[in-house]
Curated annotation (Swiss-Prot):
Protein's UniProt keywords contain Zinc: no
Encoding gene per record: aroC
Cofactor: FMNH2
Self-association and partners: Homotetramer.
Name used for this protein in its record: Chorismate synthase
SUPFAM superfamilies to which the protein is assigned, alphabetical: Chorismate synthase, AroC
Enzyme class of the recorded protein, top EC level: lyase
Alphabetized HAMAP family for the sequence: Chorismate_synth (MF_00300)
Main function: This reaction introduces a second double bond into the aromatic ring system.
Similarity section: Belongs to the chorismate synthase family.
Molecular function (Gene Ontology), one example: chorismate synthase activity
GO cellular component, one term: cytosol
Keywords associated with the record: Amino-acid biosynthesis, Aromatic amino acid biosynthesis, FAD, Flavoprotein, FMN, Lyase, NADP
One GO-annotated biological process of the protein: aromatic amino acid family biosynthetic process
């Protein structure tokens, strides 16, 4: 069973990701991880922190000479600002006089609407929001991206699967309604200021961000992850928690600020009749073919061989520059919410994080289906399964050949 966990605080010494259950033989380097972390920093509308934040990556265990060993993989991501926060975020007790002189240690008692501050303070008995916001911060997603790089490399090397994403809309901008991009389009997408796949939509998104920045406000949006090359049969229909769509939705909803997930055409299918909501099947030279992908590559909780499409809705960042009304929990008085340095819009970066969680879930599903202790063994198991699937679809291909369909 593939498992992953992260540790660390936003202004702590470092973030740590641990991946357990990955097979031996997967090629991965600290450079590959750093490249994915750099993609996470992309996007128009990011805050000042992105200008100096550099994700120094150290692989602590589980990889030797660029190849996984089969044991737990631990990855550390340094915090370049740690010297400024060393006393405030120290693990061991610090002299009270030293903390009193630090503006960074000022009590944060005015929780931000939409953030974890309020519920976290009450749940854990904190008098200060600092312990909450440090762990709840989206900075934690850097550790997830590091873990997801391992999964991404496994999917590519074992199954030939590629995971990418693009931004559908930002705020009230124009919405991208064209066909999903292919793996050859990723360079173009990452070169876009907002990771958009359409120049006109990109201009509309940038205008939205500029307007929000001028007004001292923040923006959310919608991103789509696309996965290419998946085999039929990952996931299961046998129980709810084995359904791949339930696992994907849970993983993506676990990303900070994500408030909605849909697979394929999702909510749009609720407005259609059944005759226009599903993907009809036809005979093709290689087996069953389809002309549409409304289901987004999943049927009955299982992959069906078509591209997987997962969309996520990100709410506007809750640290609003012009600040929202709140209550000071120390005095009970009405107040203005605390304001930490933040982005106007982090939707482009959210797409990379959605890719990460989708890759982790799919890698877990693939390992559950095909198993193996090494990359080579997983490949052999996959090849045997694919031969069995081809045999099962042979009558379809034979009929297609005899009838001249798809020629």
């Amino acid at each position: 069973m593939l498992r992953w966990i992260t540790a660390g605080e936003s202004h702590g010494r470092a973030l740590v990701a641990v991946v357990e259950g990955m097979v031996a033989g997967v090629e991965v380097t600290s450079t590959a991880i750093a490249d994915q972390l750099a993609r996470r920093r992309l996007g128009y509308g990011r805050g000042a922190r992105m200008a100096f934040e550099r994700d120094g990556v150290t692989v602590l265990s589980g990889v030797r000479h660029g190849v996984t060993l089969g044991g737990p993989i631990a990855i550390e991501i340094d915090n370049t600002e740690w010297p400024k926060w060393e006393s405030v975020m120290a693990a061991d007790p610090v002299d009270a006089a030293e903390l009193e002189d630090s503006a960074r240690n000022a009590p944060l008692t005015r929780p931000r609407p939409g953030h974890a501050d309020y519920a976290g303070m009450l749940k854990y008995g904190f008098d200060d929001a600092r312990p909450v916001l440090e762990r709840a911060s989206a900075r934690e997603t850097a550790a997830r991206v590091a873990a997801g790089t391992i999964a991404r490399q496994f999917l590519r090397q074992a199954l030939g699967v590629e995971v990418l994403s693009h931004v559908i809309s930002i705020g009230a901008s124009a919405r991208y309604d064209g066909p999903p991009p292919g793996s050859e389009d990723l360079t173009v997408i990452d070169a876009s200021l907002v990771r958009a796949f359409d120049e006109q939509v990109e201009k509309s998104m940038i205008a939205e961000i500029e307007a929000a920045k001028k007004d001292g406000d923040t923006l959310g949006g919608v991103v789509e992850a696309v996965v290419l090359g998946l085999p039929v049969g990952l996931g299961s229909f046998t129980s709810g928690d084995d359904r791949l769509d339930s696992q994907l939705a849970a993983a993506v909803m676990g990303i900070q600020a994500i408030k909605g997930v849909e697979i394929g055409d999702g909510f749009a299918t609720a407005r259609r009749r059944g005759s226009c909501a599903h993907d009809e099947m036809y005979s093709g030279p290689g087996g069953v073919v389809r002309l549409t992908n409304r289901s987004g590559g999943l049927e009955g909780g299982m992959t069906n061989g078509q591209p997987l499409r997962v969309r996520a809705a990100m709410k506007p960042i809750s640290t609003v520059p012009r600040a929202l009304a709140t209550v000071d929990l120390a005095t009970g008085e009405e107040a203005i919410a605390i304001h930490q340095r933040s982005d106007v819009c982090a939707v482009p970066a959210a797409g990379v994080v959605v890719e990460t969680m989708v890759a982790l879930v799919l890698a877990r599903a693939a390992l559950r289906k095909f198993g193996g202790d090494s990359l080579g063994e997983t490949r052999r198991n996959l090849a045997a399964y694919q031969r069995a699937v081809a045999d099962r679809e042979a009558p379809v291909a034979q009929y297609c050949g005899e009838s001249g369909i798809g020629g």
